[in-house]
Structure formats: structure tokens, C-alpha cells
Amino acid sequence: MLAEVEGAFAVMLMGYDCIAIDEVQQGEAGFDVQTMAVEYGTVIKEIRRTIELVGAGAMEEIVISTTGSRMIIRVLNDEFFAAFVLAKDGNLGKARYQLRMRALQLVESVS
């Protein structure tokens, strides 16, 4: 999956308990990708809780952009989410597509 997306640094399968289940990295992100995903996991839980509280439907995807990178978080089920980290100038559309197309495969890998 990473090789197919320009500017990709990592893809991780995470539990909502903020524990990385699996992770693949390539290249040098310039920061600790796993720590970033773990810390964002707490924020993601709060966003999910808020969405449920206001009745806005089920959370599907979150994109977090910083001056140096982007992280796409894709909800897989009630227990897991996938995080795709890429450079700011990486191919965001292709990364989103890859996560969406492989979501079922990722869920099956932990079931």
C-alpha cells in the first residue's frame, strides 16, 4: 500500500485503546510516527464520542494536516482504525482511496 502512494511514510492498524496492532513504515518522516498516532488516538476517541453525542452519524474518516505532514484516519469498526501518514505534498487522494479500498482486508486481518 505504501509503495503505491507518493510521499507515504507509514500505515498503521490501531486499536481505540491507542495500541498499534500492526505498522509498516518507509522513508524518514522526521518525527516519531507511532507516537503521533498514539497521541492522536485519544483525540480520535473524543471526536467519535462527540459525533455520537450530537447524532451526526457514524464517523468514517478524519484528515489531520500539519505544516509537515498529513494523517488520514479511517474507521474500520468499533475496535480499530487505520492511520495513513504522508508528507504534506504527498498524494492525499490516493492515500484516502487505498485506505477505503483496503478497509475490509485490514479488519479481516485482526478478526
Regions found by a protein language model. Give the residues of each.
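Non-catalytic interaction/Regulatory regions outside core domains
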Residues: 1-111
